């Protein structure tokens, strides 16, 4: 062992059993090792030892496992398999609300003393169905599933042994195992939640639970529902592994509980259920009052159990009894017997000095005998007397008071025990009758038996219980050893024999010929046998070698004996052993009971006799088998002896062990965590004692002796490949195809590099086997390697950082030096440049001064010349401009007056013309009113009005054009004004220049200035004149606009007059329009040979058919027209419609058409066959896709054909034929949809949804027409009308039901198809590059991957298919939204349920991948207009967030709860506890895990306190798997504008085509 400083270990503790410690000092003093340990309670202890590797040294602490292993799911995977490690692992898991833990083949179940219904839901059953043990978390259902699959696959019977002390939860565990077998589905139907009702047999099997609990369970100090008997339930299966029945065997019912209960305990539940649940009349009949009035019920004190309603439990028991075939009358007889037992308990026996007396008139006695149907005198007699039978006579003697009390209690116990056995036998008769017995192929047995018991006072019951546990423990040890051996052999590894503690000496002590039981039976058969004499025989016979190794007598007293059991030594008190072992009733009482008038009691006693005879025959057969050479027994040896309780128990135990040994056994050890039954409280010492008692620690010891730790090659390589240089494994990892041999070579390299002692491990065929402690050693190496690697990386990073810092500083110094030198040189050069520059500046300045002087003189001369030339040129330009302006002004003045005159004249002329035209129009209007009925006149009027509108429009256009010209003229004038303004600005500039220059030449330029001012005044006057002219033109423009507006108003008035005229002639115009349409339709029909008309002709067929057919033809679909196909119309029969010519005489007349139609429609057999096989089953779905645009007729052609056929049937009054026809159609459509699968599911399903919707809309349209149109009643009697309404109404309901059914069938199939893809795509696939979650290695997946993979692209393709099919097939948007929303909710539920059950899967990288996958779904929803898509995926979205955020403080958890508001506390706790910490992450602190678990507990407590409110504490989301609401029922039906007679060319429907052909011919003739 290694006890370096910092080593974590365990140290013994009086109160806690073991406490965590850490080595803080390890030194050698005087040849001894001196250790100092710091305990978790801050105490420091010292340990001195000579050898740190001495395993037998009890003073040495035990090594503690690494944190990653401390809460492991399987105790055998612990590196250090020792007592404190096992205890701590169970405690850690329990604190995290995980009540199940594996210990090799054993499942340890720790009682939570709280309701954990979420662990046993149907969802949980389906989660474990078909899963191998170890795939999911430890669970009761994993054991049940393993047993079920082994039975099914290996054809071998199975046994599940459920053991534990009272209050550990055995009964509940056994009950849920039975529920699993009764509820689990076949593997191929686990895709959708189990919805099928359980069979009657399964219900009866489950019904045995409340019956057995009522008659065999009671409240004890340790348990409110303690089983006081052992039970072995065989669930029987046939060849198809279907449950066909069951058998129950019971062991050692605690009979003494009937007559005695310790304080705070109760009698069997059934008595209290009777008191609370029996009707008042029945209670009066049975003479029952209150539980406190009966001695057999009130000894314990409180008769109530908190939280249990005995009346409700009574009803459950009664229902269960009825279910297993016990009639109400028999139940009443049973209740009478139970009531009689209570009255027996109240019998008061009088005590005398030596004897006891009992009157036959004692009230309780009379009531008891009345209910039992027996003689009270004889019954009382044998309570106080006994009879001894000798060879020659019978001796009757009196009993003393104590003996009489024992006799009274004995008969009560005898009756109750017999009743219990009879109930079991009766249940077996029902559940395993001869027919069932013949079909039995295999069974799974569930053994619910008491665990090892030891109290301050241990009696006969504890002895039998511990004897049974000795036998079971022996079988368990042998089974564990056998499995270990089998695995070693299968893996072909070297192994040596493992020593284990064999408890055979203890079993021999109990059951040998001179063992405890034999001596007990011998003493019990003696009339004067007593506990004391039996004790002396035990001492004399057994307290010597070799039995004294397991048997001893106490130091003081002669009333006890001690047996060394496998768990611990137990001292048994001999008082009552003989009496309890005899457990017989006197012959007198037996005769009295046999004379009963209670038929049920008689049947009970007969069953008891039969069982005794069977037992005696079994014993005889065993004797003959064991002594085949002996002579036949003589008369002295044929004495019939009543079997003792001990012998019966021994025999039943032998049979049980024989059964178990012939089956494959599974073990569940139930642990009671505390004595106070407090929820989620853990008592270390109590649990430790149970672990020792139930053999878990012994199992671990056996495992430790061999190779307890087993790793697959894949797991080992993934964990420890870093222990070897990367050059050795990198080549293998980089291979495209990695073989298993490559992985094994990596395994060997790792082991060769790390483990020097080859005996510490063995390499098998599929696994590596390690000795105890090796995993911790490898973990330490791995941790050291990672620590060293981290240190190296940090060292390199720090070196790189400081080197970069040094280089930066060095570079900075060099730069500074360079800059300094440069600065000095530049400063020197700058000084020299300044000297040179000063000299140069002086020379330059002198030259500049001279040049400037000369330049100023030259400039003055040039400026003078320039001014003179400018003035001369300006005068010339002014003269030219004045001339041009004068010409322009004269032109404008000359044209203005004539133009104004012309415009005024034109305006007046237009006004006069308008008035004249209006008057003419008014006259014309009056003329039109009189001629309104003339079609030609109306056309002429319309034509003239159109011309008038055109004329007015042209006038308006000319006005607009003229307005535009005026606008352009205004723009020209504005340009001129702008030029004038520019000229003025130029003059102003010139003026300023003159003012600057005239200072030196003021006198010279005075005259020039005056001249310029005169010119300026003249220019300003011209500008004013131009502005006046512009204002005049703007005024004219406004007048023109006003004139245009008036003309527009006049035009509007004219249009209004025209509208009024059109309104007055609306009726005529409509008529003309309809006539035009009719003409156009007839012309089209003439050219194409086809016509349109209503679906049904209006002519009655009374004369045609020669009978009084009801006038069903009056159903007219006013808006629904039958139109033939357009460009794709196909020939419907040999008489092609195109060949029809209305003007020719060869067309068939109406009578002939109707007669042929009637004949075709009446022969429904041919029509049904053709429609069913040819149309409905032989349909072809049109291609639907992104770029395909389908017309409605291409989609709903089956519905349109059915509508035509149906309409014609109604027209001819063929109601019965239509009913049978439609029944066939409805059945066929539903069958077709039911058979859809694969790639046809989506398009074909949408196709039939569209067609059924079309049919339903037609029927609704027809029904509304019948109910709202009075014309439909014409020609019908009231009865005929009601019959017709009823027919269509029923048809509406049928199509509504069909739509609902096929929608549900289709959607469930979609869910099933989606389930195969969703989990793989959303949960497992890693679509986000660069963030591999790393649960599995890519190169190893090449070897081990064997499942079909799906990605998010497959999911999006799936949804795209639905979208495009629904869009192409004209499905309403609301339906599309409903379908996708339902599927998204389903994806959310199943993926979340898969995630929450995944082990070693949930990591932050997995959260990134999940978030990416879900985001792609969200984006798809937004792209396709589905705004609620995000809400449907909330659980997945929030799970992804949970995996990515911090979870290390209480504040983090509180924030997390706010983020993940859709997740329940139980779901949060489950996800956090399942979170897989990466190597570079810190583990989630245990305090945080406990904090989250406490939140769940508080939530559960609140839900339990709030009555009437259901609280969902389950971890699963229940997927919505139907029934679904039909979204079509929430939207309006489709409108019927046209029913198109389109039959695709590829359809072979001769009769149907002929019907449509004839209907079309009839339409043509009706139109003609």
Curated annotation (Swiss-Prot):
GO cellular component, one term: cytoplasm
PROSITE patterns cross-referenced by the UniProt entry: DILUTE, IQ, MYOSIN_MOTOR, SH3_LIKE
Occurrences of domain Myosin motor (ranges): 70-783
CDD domains on file: fMyo2p_CBD, IQCD, MYSc_Myo5
Acetylation keyword on record: no
Family matches, as Pfam families: DIL, Myosin_head
Keywords associated with the record: Actin-binding, ATP-binding, Cell cycle, Coiled coil, Motor protein, Myosin, Nucleotide-binding, Protein transport, Repeat, Transport
Annotated positions binding ATP: 164-171
Region (Disordered): 619-641
InterPro entries: Dilute_dom (IPR002710), Fungal_Myo2/2A_CBD (IPR046943), IQ_motif_EF-hand-BS (IPR000048), Kinesin_motor_dom_sf (IPR036961), Myosin_head_motor_dom-like (IPR001609), Myosin_N (IPR004009), MYSc_Myo5 (IPR036103), P-loop_NTPase (IPR027417)
Segments forming domain Myosin N-terminal SH3-like: 4-57
Residue intervals of the IQ domain: 786-808, 809-833, 834-856, 857-881, 882-904, 905-934
Record keyword rRNA-binding present: no
Chain segments carrying region Actin-binding: 443-523
Stretches for region Non alpha-helical, tail domain: 1089-1568
Binding partners and assembly: Homodimer. Interacts with calmodulin (CMD1) and the myosin light chain MLC1 through its IQ repeats.
Family according to the record: Belongs to the TRAFAC class myosin-kinesin ATPase superfamily. Myosin family.
Protein name, as recorded: Myosin-2
């Amino acid at each position: 062992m290694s006890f370096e400083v910092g080593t974590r270990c365990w140290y013994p503790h009086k109160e806690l059993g073991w406490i965590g410690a850490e080595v803080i000092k390890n030194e050698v003093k005087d040849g001894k090792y001196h250790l100092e340990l710091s305990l978790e309670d801050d105490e420091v202890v010292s340990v001195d030892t000579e050898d740190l590797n001495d395993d037998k040294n009890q003073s040495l602490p035990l090594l503690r496992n690494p944190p990653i292993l401390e809460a492991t799911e399987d105790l055998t995977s612990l590196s250090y398999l020792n007592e404190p490690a096992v205890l701590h692992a169970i405690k850690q898991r329990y604190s995290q609300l995980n009540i199940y833990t594996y210990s090799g083949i054993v499942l340890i179940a720790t009682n939570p003393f709280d309701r954990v219904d979420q662990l046993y839901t149907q969802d949980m059953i389906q989660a474990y169905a078909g899963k191998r043990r170890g795939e999911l978390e430890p669970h009761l259902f994993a054991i049940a599933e393993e047993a079920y699959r082994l039975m099914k696959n290996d054809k071998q019977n199975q046994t599940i042994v459920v053991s534990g002390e009272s209050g550990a939860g055995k009964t509940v565990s056994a009950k849920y195992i039975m529920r699993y077998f009764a509820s689990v589905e076949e593997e191929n139907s686990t895709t959708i939640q189990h919805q099928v009702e359980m069979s009657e047999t399964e219900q009866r099997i489950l019904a045995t639970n409340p019956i057995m609990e009522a008659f065999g369970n009671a409240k004890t100090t340790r348990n409110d529902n303690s089983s006081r008997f052992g039970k072995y339930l065989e669930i029987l299966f046939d060849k198809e592994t279907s449950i066909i029945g069951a058998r129950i065997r019971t062991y050692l019912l605690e009979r003494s509980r009937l007559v005695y209960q310790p304080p705070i305990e109760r009698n069997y539940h059934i008595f209290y259920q009777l008191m609370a649940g029996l009707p008042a009349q029945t209670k009066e009949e049975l003479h029952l009052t209150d539980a406190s009035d009966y001695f057999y019920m009130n000894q314990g004190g409180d008769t109530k159990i908190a939280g249990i309603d005995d009346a409700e439990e009574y009803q459950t028991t009664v229902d269960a009894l009825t279910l297993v075939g016990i009639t109400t009358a028999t139940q009443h007889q049973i209740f009478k017997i139970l009531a009689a037992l209570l009255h027996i308990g109240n019998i008061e026996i009088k005590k005398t000095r030596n004897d006891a007396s009992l009157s036959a008139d004692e009230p309780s006695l009379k009531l008891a005998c009345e209910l039992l149907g027996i003689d009270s005198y004889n019954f009382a007699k044998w309570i106080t007397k006994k009879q001894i039978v000798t060879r020659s006579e019978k001796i009757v003697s009196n009993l003393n008071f104590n003996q009489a009390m024992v006799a009274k209690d004995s008969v009560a116990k005898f009756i109750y025990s017999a009743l219990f056995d009879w109930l079991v036998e009766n249940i077996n008769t029902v559940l395993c009758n001869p027919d069932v017995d013949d079909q039995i192929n295999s069974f799974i047995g569930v053994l619910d038996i008491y665990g090892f018991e030891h109290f301050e006072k241990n009696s006969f019951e504890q002895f039998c219980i511990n004897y049974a546990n000795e036998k079971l423990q022996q079988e368990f040890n042998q089974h564990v050893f056998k499995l270990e051996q089998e695995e070693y052999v299968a893996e072909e590894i070297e192994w040596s024999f493992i020593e284990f503690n064999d408890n055979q000496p203890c079993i021999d002590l109990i059951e040998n010929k001179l063992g405890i039981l034999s001596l007990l039976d011998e003493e019990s058969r003696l009339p004067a046998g007593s506990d004391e004499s039996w004790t002396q025989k035990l001492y004399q016979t057994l307290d010597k070698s070799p039995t004294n190794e397991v048997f001893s007598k106490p130091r003081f007293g002669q009333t006890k004996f001690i047996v060394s059991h496998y768990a611990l030594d137990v001292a048994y008190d001999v008082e009552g052993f003989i009496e309890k072992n005899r457990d017989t009733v006197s012959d007198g009482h037996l005769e009295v009971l046999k004379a009963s008038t209670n038929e049920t009691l008689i049947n009970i006693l007969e069953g008891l006799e039969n069982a005794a005879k069977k037992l005696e025959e079994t014993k005889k057969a065993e004797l003959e088998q064991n002594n085949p050479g002996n002579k036949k027994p003589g008369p002295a040896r044929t004495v019939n002896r009543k079997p003792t309780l001990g012998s019966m128990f021994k025999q039943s135990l032998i049979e049980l062990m024989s059964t178990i040994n012939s089956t494959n056994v599974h073990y569940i050890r139930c642990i009671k965590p505390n004595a106070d039954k407090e929820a989620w409280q853990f008592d270390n010492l109590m649990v430790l004692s149970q672990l020792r008692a139930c053999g878990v620690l012994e199992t671990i010891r056996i495992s430790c002796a061999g190779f307890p730790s087993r790793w697959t090659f894949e797991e080992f390589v993934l964990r420890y490949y870093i222990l070897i240089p990367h050059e050795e494994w990198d080549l293998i990892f980089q291979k495209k195809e990695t073989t298993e041999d490559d992985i094994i070579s990596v395994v060997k390299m790792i082991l060769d590099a790390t483990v020097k002692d080859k005996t510490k491990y063995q390499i098998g065929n599929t696994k590596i086997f390690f000795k105890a402690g090796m995993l911790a050693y490898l973990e330490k190496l791995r941790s050291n390697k990672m620590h060293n690697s981290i240190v190296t990386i940090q060292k390199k990073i720090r070196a790189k950082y400081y080197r970069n810092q040094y280089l930066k500083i060095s570079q900075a110094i060099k730069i500074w030096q360079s800059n300094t030198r440069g600065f000095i040189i530049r400063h020197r050069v700058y000084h020299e440049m300044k000297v040179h520059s000063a000299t140069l500046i002086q020379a330059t300045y002198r030259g500049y001064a001279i040049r400037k002087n000369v330049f100023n003189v030259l400039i003055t001369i040039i400026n003078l010349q320039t001014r003179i030339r400018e003035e001369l040129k300006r005068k010339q330009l002014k003269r030219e401009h004045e001339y041009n302006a004068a010409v322009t002004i004269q032109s404008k003045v000359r044209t203005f007056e004539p133009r104004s005159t012309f415009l005024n004249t034109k305006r007046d002329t237009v006004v006069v013309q308008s008035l004249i035209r209006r008057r003419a129009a008014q006259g014309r209007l009056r003329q039109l009113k009189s001629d309104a009925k003339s079609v030609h006149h109306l056309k002429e009027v319309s034509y003239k009005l159109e011309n008038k509108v055109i004329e007015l429009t042209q006038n308006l256009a000319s006005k607009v054009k003229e307005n535009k010209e005026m606008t352009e003229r205004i723009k020209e004038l504005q340009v001129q004004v702008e030029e004038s303004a520019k000229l003025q600005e130029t003059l102003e500039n010139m003026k300023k220049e003159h003012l600057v220059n005239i200072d030196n030449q003021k006198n010279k330029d005075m005259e020039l200035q005056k001249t310029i001012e005169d010119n300026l005044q003249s220019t300003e006057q011209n500008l004013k004149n131009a502005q006046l002219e512009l204002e005049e033109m703007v005024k004219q423009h406004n007048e023109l606009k006003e004139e245009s507006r008036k003309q527009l108003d006049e035009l509007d008035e004219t249009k209004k007059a025209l509208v009024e005229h059109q309104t007055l002639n609306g009726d005529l115009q409509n008529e003309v329009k309809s006539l035009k349409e009719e003409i156009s339709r007839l012309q089209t029909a003439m050219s194409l040979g086809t016509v349109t008309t209503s679906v049904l002709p209006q002519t009655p067929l009374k004369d045609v058919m020669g009978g009084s057919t009801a006038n069903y033809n009056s159903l007219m679909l006013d808006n629904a027209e039958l139109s033939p196909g357009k460009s794709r119309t196909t020939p419907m029969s040999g008489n092609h419609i195109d060949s029809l010519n209305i003007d020719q005489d060869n067309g068939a007349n109406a009578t002939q058409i109707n007669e042929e139609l009637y004949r075709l429609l009446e022969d429904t057999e041919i029509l049904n066959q053709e429609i069913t096989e040819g149309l409905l089953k032989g349909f072809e779905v049109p291609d639907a896709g992104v770029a395909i645009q389908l017309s409605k007729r291409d989609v709903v052609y089956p519905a349109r054909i059915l509508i035509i056929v149906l309409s014609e049937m109604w027209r001819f009054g063929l109601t019965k034929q239509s009913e049978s026809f439609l029944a066939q159609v409805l059945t066929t459509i539903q069958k077709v949809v039911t058979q859809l699968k694969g790639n046809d599911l989506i398009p074909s399903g949408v196709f039939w949804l569209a067609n059924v919707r079309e049919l339903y809309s037609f029927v609704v349209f027809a029904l509304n027409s019948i109910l709202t149109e009075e014309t439909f009643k014409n020609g019908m009697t009231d009865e005929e009308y009601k019959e017709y309404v009823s027919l269509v109404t029923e048809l509406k309901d049928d199509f509504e039901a069909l739509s609902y059914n096929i929608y549900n069938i289709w959607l469930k199939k979609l869910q099933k198809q989606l389930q195969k893809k969703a989990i793989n795509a959303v949960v497992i696939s890693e679509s986000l590059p660069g963030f591999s979650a790393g649960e599995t290695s890519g190169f190893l997946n090449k070897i081990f991957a064997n499942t079909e993979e799906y990605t998010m692209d497959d999911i999006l393709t799936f949804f795209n298919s639905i979208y495009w099919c629904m869009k192409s097939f004209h499905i309403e948007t609301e339906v599309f939204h409903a379908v996708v929303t339902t599927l998204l909710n389903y994806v959310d539920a199943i993926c979340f349920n898969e995630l929450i059950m995944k082990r070693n899967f949930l990591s932050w990288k997995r959260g990134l991948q999940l978030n990416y996958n879900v985001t792609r779904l969200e984006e798809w929803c937004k792209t396709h207009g589905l705004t609620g898509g995000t809400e449907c995926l909330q659980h997945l979205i929030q799970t992804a967030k949970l995996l990515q955020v911090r979870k290390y403080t209480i504040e983090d958890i509180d924030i997390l709860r706010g983020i993940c508001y859709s997740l329940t506390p139980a779901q949060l706790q489950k996800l956090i506890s399942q979170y897989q910490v990466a190597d570079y992450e810190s583990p989630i602190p245990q305090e945080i895990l406990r904090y989250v678990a406490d939140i769940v507990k508080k939530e559960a407590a609140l839900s339990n306190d709030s009555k009437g409110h259901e609280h969902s504490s389950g971890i699963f989301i229940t997927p919505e798997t139907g029934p679904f609401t039909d979204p079509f029922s929430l939207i309006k039906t489709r409108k019927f504008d046209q029913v198109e007679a389109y039959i695709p060319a590829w359809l072979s429907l001769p009769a149907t085509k002929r019907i449509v052909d004839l209907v079309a011919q009839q339409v043509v003739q009706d139109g003609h």
